[in-house]
Amino acid sequence: MQYYKELARRLHTLQSKNEKEALEKQIDFLDKLVVEVDSLVHEQDLRPLLEFISPTESWFLLGTATIFYIKLLTHPDPESIDVVIKEAYVVRAHRILSIFQEQFIENVVKEINWEILAILISLSGIENGLVRNLSEFLSTSILSAVPRQKFLLYLLEKYQINLFHREERLTDQGRPVAFELPPDKFHSDQSKALLEPKWKTKNYLISHLIFWIIDQQSSSSIEVCWHRIIPSVLRILNDLSPNIKLQGIELVNRLLKITEREFLLYTGILKILKDDLLVFYTFIPPRFTIQTSVTLINASFATLVSLYPEENENLNSIMLNGINSVFQFAFDYPLILQAAFSQIMVLTDKMNVSYLPYLTLTLDELCRIIQNPQIIQIPSTLSFFLEILTKLLEIYSYRISAHHVELLMALVVCSRNYMRCNLQEHHNAIVQALQNLFTLIKLNITVEQLGDYNVILPLLEPLQIPL
């Protein structure tokens, strides 16, 4: 017994140190412990180790196979931990926890250890299937034996608040200590607080717990606990980590599904959410990778449209304060532009004639894009933008005559630059798209404007584009 007590003491000491160092020192111990536990299971005599899984004792097995295990799995920067060591630890800790799962459930229920239950539910969102399945089994078993409403009350009134609570020390004069620091130190601390908020070190997977809380609510009960849930959702939505932001958007979508629209308008939360989501259009390279930016912008757009599905004022905001930011700051990123124009097609479908005030801006941007050498050298991307231009001109064909000069000039430049590149991929489709656009313009301009069309014909003859 003394041997196990000494190990328990050492493991508790290691938990306060660097994760990687602690893991390396625990691997050998866990190997020996797994072998010993397996032998005890085989002999059907777990009594020598039972006292060490009790939360009232040394938290020995809980400390090794659960608490530290959970800290590792919910670590905000998993890349900082060696993957091989991490997997080795997880497998061994999982084995121990699996063997003692009945005693674990019994002790958590007996001690009403809500925090452990909260973290187990959070782990349902982890990628590791082994861990996720065990966590779901344990949390389901514990929930069936404890008062669910009391647990929900604990999560709403204590756990969330403590997790997101900001500890701010004050000077004798009542001013925050941070403001008394030298400027360099102040900015350093503030930056670290924004990038690495303390809640991430406590439960990096908190959003999955909030998913669970929301799923337990009805349209009436969500209104009662609204003031407890929405601050946490907004904290997650406004986090600087892209992955956390995406979870925040999903949380907003869950709330929108069960909350009455009148209640959202009454509380003013719709406008707050709209403003927060529009900021996503500024998350472009080099701050984020191109793919991350596209993912954030697309997710934000889908939620923004659902906020005010029938109101043009909201759709106007998406165009002016959202997509317009992409035009201004992401012109050199074709994938982001593709996402923006895909969204524009959705807006034109919803707004119809109400989109006309933005048609000139949209056509000007498209003309710039199809003349961009960077775009022309990517046939699939060029084909996409030519298709978008064709669809827009078909929808608003009665406005072609007002823009025919800019359109013809852009198409001539695009055609000449494309033919010079001598690209074979999508060649027939691109030539056909250019031909269709010239024809579409010709059919929708006045007799007087046909003179402008005829002027460009000699420029196209060497390009072998049939008109």
From Swiss-Prot:
Location(s), subcellular: Nucleus
Name of the protein in its database record: Tel2-interacting protein 2
Entry keyword set: Chromatin regulator, Coiled coil, Nucleus
Family: Belongs to the TTI2 family.
Cellular component aspect of the GO annotation: cytosol; nucleus; TTT Hsp90 cochaperone complex
Subunit structure: Component of the TTT complex composed of tel2, tti1 and tti2. Interacts with tel2 and ttiI1. Component of the ASTRA complex composed of at least rvb1, rvb2, tra1, tel2, tti1 and tti2.
Coiled-coil intervals: 4-45
GO biological-process terms attached to the record: 'de novo' cotranslational protein folding; chromatin organization
Function in brief: Component of the tel2-tti1-tti2 (TTT) complex that stabilizes protein levels of the phosphatidylinositol 3-kinase-related protein kinase (PIKK) family proteins. The TTT complex is involved in the cellular resistance to DNA damage stresses, like ionizing radiation (IR), ultraviolet (UV) and mitomycin C (MMC). Component of the ASTRA complex involved in chromatin remodeling.
GO molecular function terms attached to this record: protein-macromolecule adaptor activity
